[in-house]
UniProtKB/Swiss-Prot annotation:
This is Glycerol-3-phosphate acyltransferase. Pfam families: G3P_acyltransf. Keywords: Cell inner membrane, Cell membrane, Lipid biosynthesis, Lipid metabolism, Membrane, Phospholipid biosynthesis, Phospholipid metabolism, Transferase, Transmembrane, Transmembrane helix. NCBIfam families: glycerol-3-phosphate 1-O-acyltransferase PlsY (TIGR00023). HAMAP family: PlsY. InterPro entries: G3P_acylTferase_PlsY. GO terms for cellular component: plasma membrane. It is found in: Cell inner membrane. It catalyses: an acyl phosphate + sn-glycerol 3-phosphate = a 1-acyl-sn-glycero-3-phosphate + phosphate. Belongs to the PlsY family. It is a multi-pass membrane protein. GO terms for biological process: phospholipid biosynthetic process. It comes from Ralstonia nicotianae (strain ATCC BAA-1114 / GMI1000) (Ralstonia solanacearum).
Length: 207
């Protein structure tokens, strides 16, 4: 298999892995309402938490992070065998993230990508992932807004990468991922500015 074909295969596989929406899968398995029908309507861990089921929210968080990590880890593992370099891995990063945002298995209606991005960053570098997660935790602890924590973390993640490894294709992929994540939070940004954003742990009962 040529390098180009391998890169395409890795990217398609990453997209398909990213397309598994654990918010929907876990909610169905546990007999809960579809997270796209209540709260923010976002199929993600924070919205699942609004159902009042912490176990489901934790499983969603872990699943979405794990798929991001798995997609990139597998590509990195196999890349040397087929001569796939950083540019190819960068495409895998973007493909996995797009899979979560626009999942083929769920009518292209996906989440905002916070947990999946965290998994991807951890796969690229443990230090990068931990620095970004620490940023999220600090903002979330002090302000109690998951969306604000995600936005701040998204802004800092590319800079953390550049500080650790310099500017390369992966830095560009992380920047693209951050822009996409911020774009998915447009409604949250508007609510934050209006003082109407829901805080972490607030329950919005399914309708």
């Amino acid at each position: 298999m040529s390098t180009v074909v391998a890169t395409v295969v890795f990217a398609v596989a990453a997209y398909l892995i990213g397309s598994v929406s654990f918010a929907v899968v876990v909610s169905r398995a546990m007999g809960l309402a579809d997270p796209r029908t209540y709260g923010s309507g976002n199929p993600g861990a924070t919205n699942v938490l609004r159902s009042g089921n912490k176990k489901a929210a934790i499983l969603t968080l872990l699943g979405d992070a794990a798929k991001g990590w798995l997609a990139v880890w597998l590509a990195q593992l196999l890349a040397p065998r087929y001569g796939v370099e950083d540019m190819g891995i960068a495409l895998v990063v973007i493909a996995a993230f797009l899979g979560h945002l626009y999942p083929v298995f769920h009518r292209f209606t996906g989440g905002k990508g916070v947990a999946t991005a965290a998994g991807i960053l951890l796969a690229l570098s443990g230090w990068l992932g931990l620095a970004t997660l620490a940023t999220w935790l600090i903002i979330a602890t002090f302000f109690r807004y998951s969306s604000l924590a995600a936005l701040v973390s998204a802004v800092f993640a590319p800079f953390y990468y550049v500080l650790l490894f310099g500017i390369d294709p992966l830095a560009g992929a992380i920047a693209v991922m951050s822009v996409l994540l911020i774009a998915r939070h447009r409604a949250n940004i508007a609510k934050l500015l209006a003082g109407k954003e829901s805080r972490i742990g607030e329950k919005k009962k399914p309708t």
